[in-house]
């Protein structure tokens, strides 16, 4: 649990299984305190954050000995006084034991950190959907660019922590660094405001193989394994440290589901073109072969300000991207339409994956006239993605800022599947309508 204040004082945290019975605590001596480096003497060895308002104190409390898959309530304090209003407590749910049969719901958003009305509407639409469906989130994935325009500490505070305060008080966020955060943060040294903002598992605290860095990591949720990569400022070549760790992590996992996420999309024709930009080309040609040999089911990215979703595909490493003989199922994947995509139970090499570009979380949207040839759905609307794991079925839904489900597909793992490549798959038509969507919505004046 991480929090900040602007004054000196004795930090405290209490937690428990009931909101009105926070009967456990951590000694203040065991709470890590970080101060902005500019507030410290030049030769200080004291823990620090790279930047922040003068007088900032960042507190990090690592809580151990908790029960798995259990909801806890917590409250933080200073000098014995609660920092939240009376009656308000935060919550967190611990991860289930890896391999446990456990349903899970995850929210995915990208390119959202603007602090504008569209970001707020996307967030509100998700929370309204949860209330309507009587669901709670098990996790929150952000695929980068959560702090426009330069990933400054002040932008993290205003455009991420304040904008998503309700959700962050009760849900763990698993982040990937975007190019805007990369302007003031470094993946090589794992320093800067991005790395101050999050505490990511570098020593396999949440499953997987220890990466030794917060720049890339993995975690388990029941029978699903999630991998976060740095596509911005670390080497992407197969012999590099990140790719070598990825191979080791894939070899170890015994999960039934494999989800990977990072910022720069291997396939897009939105505000960016994956056939023309180095980071996108290299993630496609160098990283995707490793993931597909490990049986990846779903890849989540952002950067391109649009919603795009592919057909079931495998082996599309060439530049430019073509669809011939890399599409395994060219249907829509919708159980109410052409039917779900099918894969064998467990993780098998090269049985296909779906790519989602979810860069439509709150900044100006745009697209090219012709969609990527591997995409089944291309939508120029603000929104986010909901991932629902239930047994042998993964359901993905794109929820727009007005609360409408605009795209749905499923992957069902049942029976042994024989891979068949389609020589001439369905091709997306030219997209009619506007090529850009500005930062406003119906009825707004900005």
PLM segments and residue spans:
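Extended active-site neighborhood of metal-dependent phosphoesterases/phosphodiesterases
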Residues: 53, 62, 73-93, 131, ...
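Active-site metal-binding loops of divalent metal-dependent hydrolases
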Residues: 109-113, 144-147, 179-180, 231-232, ...
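Conserved, compact domain cores that house catalytic/ligand-binding motifs in diverse enzymes
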Residues: 102-176, 181
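Acidic, histidine-bearing metal-coordination/catalytic regions of metal-dependent phosphoesterases
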Residues: 1-120, 124-137, 348, 380, ...
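Short, solvent-exposed loop/turn segments at secondary-structure junctions
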Residues: 150, 268-269
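Feature marks short, surface-exposed loop/turn motifs that line or immediately flank catalytic pockets
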Residues: 9, 19, 181, 235, ...
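Conserved beta-strand->loop/alpha-helix structural units within folded catalytic cores of enzymes
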Residues: 140-146, 178, 249-250, 261-264, ...
């Amino acid at each position: 649990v991480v929090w900040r204040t602007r004054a000196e004082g004795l930090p405290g945290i209490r937690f428990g299984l009931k909101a009105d019975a926070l009967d456990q605590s951590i000694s203040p001596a065991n709470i890590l305190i970080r101060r902005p480096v500019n507030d410290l003497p030049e030769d200080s060895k004291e823990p620090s954050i790279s930047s922040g308002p003068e007088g900032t104190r960042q507190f990090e409390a690592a809580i151990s000995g908790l029960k798995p898959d259990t909801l806890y309530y917590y409250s933080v304090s200073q000098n014995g006084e609660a920092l939240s209003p009376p009656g308000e407590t935060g919550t967190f749910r611990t991860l289930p034991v890896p391999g446990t049969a456990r349903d899970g719901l995850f929210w995915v958003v990208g390119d959202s950190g603007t602090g504008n009305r569209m970001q707020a509407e996307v967030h509100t639409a998700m929370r309204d959907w949860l209330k309507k469906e009587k669901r709670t989130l098990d996790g929150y994935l952000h695929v980068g660019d959560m702090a426009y325009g330069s990933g400054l500490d002040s932008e993290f505070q205003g455009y991420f922590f304040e904008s998503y305060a309700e959700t962050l008080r009760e849900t763990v966020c698993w982040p990937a660094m975007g190019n805007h955060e990369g302007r003031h943060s470094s993946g090589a040294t794992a320093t800067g405001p991005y790395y101050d903002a999050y505490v990511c598992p570098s020593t396999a605290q949440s499953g997987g193989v220890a990466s030794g860095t917060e720049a890339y990591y993995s975690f388990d949720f029941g029978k699903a394994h999630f991998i976060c990569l740095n596509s911005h400022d670390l080497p992407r070549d197969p012999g590099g440290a990140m790719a070598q760790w990825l191979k080791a992590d894939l070899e170890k996992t015994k999960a039934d589901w494999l989800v990977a996420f990072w910022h720069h999309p291997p396939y897009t024709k939105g505000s960016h073109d994956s056939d023309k930009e180095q980071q996108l080309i290299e993630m496609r040609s160098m990283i995707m072969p490793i993931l597909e040999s490990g049986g990846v089911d779903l890849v989540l990215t952002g950067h391109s300000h649009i919603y795009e979703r592919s057909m079931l595909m495998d082996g599309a490493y060439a530049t430019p991207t073509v669809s011939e003989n890399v599409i395994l199922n060219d249907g829509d994947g919708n159980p109410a339409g052409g039917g779900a995509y099918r894969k064998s139970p467990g993780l098998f090499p090269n049985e296909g994956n779906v790519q989602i570009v979810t860069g439509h979380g709150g900044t100006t949207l745009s697209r090219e006239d012709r969609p990527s040839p591997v995409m089944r759905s291309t939508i120029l609307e603000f929104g986010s993605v909901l991932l629902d794991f239930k047994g042998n079925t993964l359901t993905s839904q794109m929820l727009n800022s007005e609360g409408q489900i605009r795209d749905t597909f499923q992957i069902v793992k049942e029976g042994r599947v024989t891979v068949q490549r389609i020589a001439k798959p369905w091709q997306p038509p030219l997209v009619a309508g506007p090529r850009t969507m500005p930062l406003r919505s119906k009825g707004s004046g900005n």
